[in-house]
C-alpha cells in the first residue's frame, strides 16, 4: 500500500524526522512550518484551549504554548534564527534614538525606552532591542567615559600662561590632593622642602646593621611636621617620657612629694593619730577615749604602701627614718610579768610599725583587750601574724 504525502509539509523530510506521542510528524532541529503556526494562532483566537489545539493538530503541548506565548508577547509567529547569531538590532539609528531619549530624560528606564521605540515605530516587534541590549548600549555607547582626554585643539586656543596654569593645577591635584600637604593646604614649595628634609633624615640616621630604615629621631621629626611649636613639642616629650607605672623593685628614683598625696594617705593619717594617742596617754582606759589634736607623725610613702598591700609580693623594709617602735615602748603596754622581751620574734614583722599589724590601734593598751590573755601567751592577733 502506497502512502501519498503530497499535501504533507514534512513529506520531503520524513527521513530526518519522527512521530510524537500524539501521532504527529516532526523534524529534528527544524521549527514548525508557518502554516501550522498560523493555524495554532487562528484556533487560539477562536477560543480553543491549547490542549485541544495540541490534540487537533497533533503538535506537542509545549510547542503550542511556546508559539502562543511568543505571539502574545511580540505579535510575531516567526521562529527564531536557526544557526549563527541574531541579526544586529543596535543599528546606528536605534543607538542615536536611545541617546536622544537618555539625554531628554536621564532617569528613563530601559523598558520605557523599548516601549517608546515601538510607539514611535523606530523598531518593530522583531527588530526592537531587548532590555538588556538597551542597558548595554547606554553603558558602552551613550554614556561618555570619564577618562577621555581633552583634544589637543583646545590647548592651542588658550594662551601659554593659561596652559601652564592648567597643567600645574592638574598635576598638583593629581599628585598631592590625597596627600597630607594637599589636605592641610600646604604649598608645593613647603611640601618639597619637607620631603627633602625627610630624605636627609633617612640618610643621616642609618641603622648599624646596614639597613637604611629611619631611626627614632627621624620618626619623631616626620610625625611632628610643622603642626606644633617648639614649646609644645617639649611639653609632649616630657609627658610621654614620664614613667607612669613605676617598678617597685627596680626603680631607684626618689618619690616626688606630690606623688604621696593620695586619698589612701588621708585615711592612714587618722589611724596613726589614734595609735599615737593611745600610746602616749596611759589614762585611756576604754575604747571610746578622747583622741588628742593632730600630732606630727611621719607618713608612709605611696611606694611603701603599694609594696606592703600587694598580695604575693615580699614586704618592703621601711627606711631608717620610718622604723618601727622600740621594744620598751611596746612592752610598756603589757605588764612585765606577763610579757617580757621583744614582743614579736618573727623577723618579717618585727621591723614594721604597729599601724600595719593592728587594724584598730585604739584597742592597744586597753585592759579589756588583754583580759583573756593573762596566762602569759601573746595576744591572739600577734599569734595569728606569727603563723604566717
UniProtKB/Swiss-Prot annotation:
Chain residue ranges for the region called PAI subdomain: 18-74
Pfam families in the record: PAX, Pax2_C
Stored PROSITE patterns: PAIRED_1, PAIRED_2
GO terms assigned for molecular function: DNA binding; DNA-binding transcription factor activity; DNA-binding transcription factor activity, RNA polymerase II-specific; RNA polymerase II cis-regulatory region sequence-specific DNA binding
Sequence intervals crossing the membrane: none
Reported tissue expression: First detected in mid-neurula embryos in the folding neural tube. With the completion of neurulation, expression becomes localized to the midbrain/hindbrain boundary (MHB) till at least stage 40. Expression is absent from regions adjacent to the MHB. In tailbuds, weakly and transiently expressed in the developing otic vesicle from stage 21 to stage 27.
Main location as per UniProt: nucleus
Subcellular location: Nucleus
GO terms (BP aspect): nervous system development; regulation of DNA-templated transcription; regulation of transcription by RNA polymerase II; sensory organ development
Renumbered residue ranges of the record's region RED subdomain: 93-141
Nucleus among keywords: yes
Chain intervals with Polar residues compositional bias: 143-158
Gene3D superfamilies, per the entry: Winged helix-like DNA-binding domain superfamily/Winged helix DNA-binding domain
CDD domains: PAX
Stretches for region Disordered: 143-162, 191-217
Top-level taxon of origin: Eukaryota
InterPro entries xrefs: Homeodomain-like_sf, PAIRED_DNA-bd_dom, Paired_dom, Pax2_C, PAX_fam, WH-like_DNA-bd_sf
GO cellular component term of the entry, any: nucleus
Keyword list, A-Z: Developmental protein, DNA-binding, Nucleus, Paired box, Transcription, Transcription regulation
DNA-binding region: 15-141
General function of this protein: Probable transcription factor.
Protein name: Paired box protein Pax-5
Organism for this UniProt entry: Xenopus laevis (African clawed frog)
Encoding gene (name): pax5
